[in-house]
Amino acid sequence: MAETQVRNFNINFGPQHPAAHGVLRLVLELDGEVVERVDPHIGLLHRGTEKLMEAKTYLQAVPYLDRLDYVAPMNQEHAYALAVERLLDIEVPKRGQLIRVLYSEIGRILNHLLNVTTQAMDVGALTPPLWGFEEREKLMVFYERACGARMHAAYFRPGGVHQDLPDQLIEDIGKWIDPFFTTLKNLDDLITPNRIFKQRNVDIGVVKLEDAWAWGFSGVMVRGSGAAWDLRKSQPYECYSEMEFDIPVGKNGDCYDRYLIRMEEMRQSVRIMRQCVDLLLGKERVGPVSNTDHKIVPPKRGEMKRSMEALIHHFKLYTEGYHVPAGEVYAAVEAPKGEFGVYLVSDGSNKPYRCKLRAPGFAHLQAMDFLCRGHMLADVSAILGSLDIVFGEVDR
C-alpha cells in the first residue's frame, strides 16, 4: 500500500477567541494535537500612538499613555512623567512621590488580580474572576476619587500629580488593606492547591533564565525563571528605595511559578501601600504634591482668580505648553507586566520630537513560538494567560 504524506494542519487561534486576550491572531501549525509552529499576527489594535504624540504638547500627550496598558493606566503615565522630569531636571516633592507610589501599587494589584483570575478562567475555573472583579471595583473607585476617572486617569503629570488626595480617601485605602488579605487567602486556597489548575500549569511554558534574557523578557517573566530583577530595587525611582518589600522569585520558570509570583507580588504591593498610607497620614500629611515651578506646573485655581501672573501662566501652559531642553532620555518603571520604558527625544520645542514606548508585552509575545513549540494545543491558552498580554501596549 502506498505511503501517504501527512501534512501538518494549520489553524487560526483568534482574533475572536475568548482566550486570545483581545485581538491576538495566532496561526498555529499542528501535528495532530502537538504545536509545531506559532505565528503571532499583531497590529489589529494599532493606533499610531507614538506618531500622534509628536503633534501634541508634553502635557497633552499624557492621556495617550493611559490607553496603552489600560488595565493599569497610571503605571504607564509614571514612566512618561519621569522621562519629562529628567529632561526638565525638576524634582517631585515627597508627598507627590508617595501618592505616585501608592497609585502605582494599586495599578499593580489591579493588573495582577485580572491576570491571575483570567489565567484560572483560561484553564476552566470560572469562580476566581468574579471574586477578582469585586476587589478591582473597589480599587477603581479609589482611582475615581483621586482624579474623576475610573480608567483613563491622566493623574500623573510631569512635575508631580494633578491634585492632592483628601485625608478621607487615604484613610479608606488604609481600611481596604486588611480585608484584601482575606480575599487573597480565599483566592489562594481555591486556585493554588487545585489539582486541575496544577496539571494545566506545572512544567508548561518553561523558560530558562538565559533564554529569558535573550528574548528580552522583564518583570514576572524573568523573576519566574530565577532572577531577582525588579527595577524598584535594582534601579530605584521615586521613593521606592525607602520602602520595605521583598521580591518573589520562582525556581522552575513555568506558568505555575509565574502565577505564584503574581500572587505574592500582590501581598508585597499591599505592604508598600500600607507604608505610603502611614506616611501620607503621618509626617507627610501636608506639603505640595507637585513641583512649584509655575513655568511647568499650572498654578492653583484659587491663585488664578486672584493673580494676573497666575492667569497668564495658566493660559500659556494650556495653550502653548512648556519648552523642554533639547536632549534624549530613557526612563523605565517596573510596570505590572514588566519593564515599561519611554525613550524621549526633545528638540527644544514644546512637543516631543520622538517618543518611543518600550512595551513589555511586545517582547513576551514574540517568544510565543519558542514557548509553545512541542506543547499541546490546549497549553497554548495556558501559556498565553501566563504571559499577561494586553493589546493596547503591544500594538500601540
UniProtKB/Swiss-Prot annotation:
<comment type="similarity">
    <text>Belongs to the complex I 49 kDa subunit family.</text>
</comment>
<dbReference type="InterPro" id="IPR022885">
    <property type="entry name" value="NDH1_su_D/H"/>
</dbReference>
<dbReference type="GO" id="GO:0048038">
    <property type="term" value="F:quinone binding"/>
</dbReference>
<dbReference type="Pfam" id="PF00346">
    <property type="entry name" value="Complex1_49kDa"/>
</dbReference>
<dbReference type="InterPro" id="IPR029014">
    <property type="entry name" value="NiFe-Hase_large"/>
</dbReference>
<keyword id="KW-1003">Cell membrane</keyword>
<dbReference type="InterPro" id="IPR014029">
    <property type="entry name" value="NADH_UbQ_OxRdtase_49kDa_CS"/>
</dbReference>
<keyword id="KW-0830">Ubiquinone</keyword>
<keyword id="KW-1278">Translocase</keyword>
<dbReference type="InterPro" id="IPR001135">
    <property type="entry name" value="NADH_Q_OxRdtase_suD"/>
</dbReference>
<protein>
    <recommendedName>
        <fullName>NADH-quinone oxidoreductase subunit D</fullName>
        <ecNumber>7.1.1.-</ecNumber>
    </recommendedName>
</protein>
<comment type="subunit">
    <text>NDH-1 is composed of 14 different subunits. Subunits NuoB, C, D, E, F, and G constitute the peripheral sector of the complex.</text>
</comment>
<keyword id="KW-0472">Membrane</keyword>
<keyword id="KW-0813">Transport</keyword>
<dbReference type="GO" id="GO:0051287">
    <property type="term" value="F:NAD binding"/>
</dbReference>
<keyword id="KW-0520">NAD</keyword>
<keyword id="KW-0997">Cell inner membrane</keyword>
<keyword id="KW-0874">Quinone</keyword>
<comment type="function">
    <text>NDH-1 shuttles electrons from NADH, via FMN and iron-sulfur (Fe-S) centers, to quinones in the respiratory chain. The immediate electron acceptor for the enzyme in this species is believed to be ubiquinone. Couples the redox reaction to proton translocation (for every two electrons transferred, four hydrogen ions are translocated across the cytoplasmic membrane), and thus conserves the redox energy in a proton gradient.</text>
</comment>
<dbReference type="GO" id="GO:0005886">
    <property type="term" value="C:plasma membrane"/>
</dbReference>
<dbReference type="GO" id="GO:0050136">
    <property type="term" value="F:NADH:ubiquinone reductase (non-electrogenic) activity"/>
</dbReference>
